[in-house]
C-alpha cells in the first residue's frame, strides 16, 4: 500500500542571509512544510509533493533510482533565493510506493492531486519516473471533468507505448484511454521529441491521436505552436521529463539525450504556459540522483521548478 510521509525538515536547510535585509530570504525560509496531508487548509497555494516511485522505469528496462528524486530536488531547491511566488509553496510530503505496486501508487497520487485541485490548490509534483504523469494527469482530469484539459509534455519520448501493463513509457496512452472512457477530447502536445528515440509505430500512434508534436530540432522556433495549443484549452497540465535536456546539462536520467533541447529553450517554451492563467498542475520527472556526481544536475532540475513557481499565474 502506498504510504504518505511528511518531508523531513532536514531537507529544507540553507544559508541565512536575513541579517542583511528582511527580503534576503531563500526557499527554505519561504516554503511552508506541512506535517499532515491537508490541502483544504492551503487554498490558493501551490502543493509541492513528491512521488517516490520508479517501478515504471524498472518495467520499461530503464535505470532505476528516480525514487530518490523528490528529496534530492528539495535539497537543491532549498538554498535558492526566494522571489515572488515562492511564498505560495506548501510542502505536502511524499507518496512512497512499495515495489511493485505501481498501479496502487498511481491511484494514490491521482486521488491526492484531485483533492488538492478541488481544494483550490495547484500542484507541483517531483518525480519519480514518468509513470508519475498518469497519476498526476488523471487527477487533473478528475478535478476538471467539465473543462478541456491540455497536456503539455516536454520530453524526448512520446510515451505512447502499448504494453500489457503500465510503465514509464505508457502514461499518455493511458491518459488517452482515460479520455476515451470519459468521452472527452484528448489534447496532448509533446515538445522536444527525438525521432531517433521513437519508433515509427509511436509516430503513427501520435498521428492517429492528433498529437501536436515538435521535434528537438525545431524547438528553437516553437513558441507559436505552444501559444496555439494554450489557446485551445481551458486548463493545462505541464509535465517535464528531464531527459528532454541534452546529456551535457542532464546526465542524471534513465535515458540521457544525445541531442536534446537546451535549458534556455525549455524555459522560453514554458514561460507562456506558466503565465497563461490556465496552468493547474506541473511536474518534473525522471531525475535520478544516482547519476548526479556533484549535484549539478539537481541544480539544473531545481532551476526549472524554481522558475515554474516564480512565473506561475
Swiss-Prot record:
Cofactor(s) essential for the protein:
Mn(2+)
GO MF, one annotated term: formimidoylglutamase activity
| Pathway linked to the protein | Amino-acid degradation; L-histidine degradation into L-glutamate; L-glutamate from N-formimidoyl-L-glutamate (hydrolase route): step 1/1
For this UniProt entry, which segments traverse the membrane?
none
Which reaction is this enzyme known to catalyze?
N-formimidoyl-L-glutamate + H2O = formamide + L-glutamate
The record lists Mn(2+) 2 as bound by: 155, 157, 241, 243
Biological process according to GO: L-histidine catabolic process to glutamate and formamide; L-histidine catabolic process to glutamate and formate; putrescine biosynthetic process from arginine, via agmatine
Q: Which Pfam families match?
A: Arginase
Key word Hydrolase present in the record? yes
Query: Can you quote the record's cofactor note?
Result: Binds 2 manganese ions per subunit.
The EC number on file is: 3.5.3.8
Gene3D superfamilies in the cross-refs: Ureohydrolase domain
Into which EC class is this enzyme placed? hydrolase
Q: What does this protein do?
A: Catalyzes the conversion of N-formimidoyl-L-glutamate to L-glutamate and formamide.
The protein's name is Formimidoylglutamase
Amino acid at each position: 500500500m502506498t504510504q504518505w510521509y511528511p518531508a523531513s525538515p532536514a531537507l529544507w536547510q540553507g544559508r541565512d542571509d536575513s541579517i542583511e535585509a528582511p527580503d534576503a530570504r531563500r526557499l527554505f525560509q519561504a516554503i511552508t512544510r506541512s506535517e499532515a496531508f491537508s490541502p483544504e487548509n492551503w487554498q490558493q497555494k501551490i502543493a509541492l509533493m513528491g512521488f517516490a516511485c520508479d517501478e515504471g522505469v524498472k518495467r520499461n528496462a530503464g535505470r532505476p533510482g528516480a525514487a530518490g528524486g523528490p528529496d534530492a530536488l528539495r535539497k537543491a531547491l532549498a538554498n535558492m533565493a526566494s522571489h515572488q511566488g515562492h511564498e505560495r509553496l506548501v510542502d505536502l510530503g511524499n507518496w512512497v510506493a512499495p515495489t511493485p505496486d505501481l498501479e496502487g501508487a498511481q491511484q494514490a497520487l491521482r486521488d491526492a492531486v484531485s483533492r488538492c485541485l478541488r481544494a483550490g490548490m495547484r500542484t507541483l509534483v517531483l518525480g519519480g519516473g514518468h509513470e508519475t504523469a498518469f497519476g498526476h494527469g488523471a487527477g487533473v482530469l478528475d478535478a476538471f471533468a467539465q473543462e478541456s484539459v491540455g497536456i503539455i509534455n516536454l520530453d524526448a519520448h512520446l510515451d505512447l507505448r502499448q504494453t500489457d501493463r503500465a510503465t514509464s513509457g505508457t502514461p499518455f496512452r493511458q491518459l488517452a484511454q482515460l479520455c476515451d472512457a470519459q468521452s472527452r477530447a484528448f489534447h496532448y502536445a509533446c515538445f522536444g521529441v527525438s525521432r531517433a528515440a521513437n519508433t515509427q509505430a509511436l509516430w503513427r500512434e501520435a498521428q492517429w491521436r492528433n498529437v501536436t508534436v515538435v521535434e528537438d530540432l525545431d524547438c528553437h522556433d516553437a513558441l507559436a505552436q505552444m501559444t496555439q495549443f494554450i489557446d485551445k484549452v481551458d486548463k493545462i497540465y505541464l509535465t517535464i521529463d528531464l531527459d528532454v535536456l541534452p546529456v551535457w546539462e542532464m546526465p542524471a536520467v534513465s535515458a540521457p539525450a544525445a541531442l536534446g533541447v537546451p535549458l534556455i529553450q525549455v524555459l522560453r517554451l514554458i514561460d507562456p504556459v506558466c503565465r497563461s492563467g490556465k496552468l493547474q498542475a506541473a511536474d518534473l520527472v525522471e531525475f535520478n540522483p544516482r547519476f548526479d556526481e556533484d549535484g549539478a544536475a539537481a541544480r539544473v532540475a531545481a532551476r526549472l521548478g524554481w522558475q515554474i513557481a516564480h512565473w506561475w499565474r
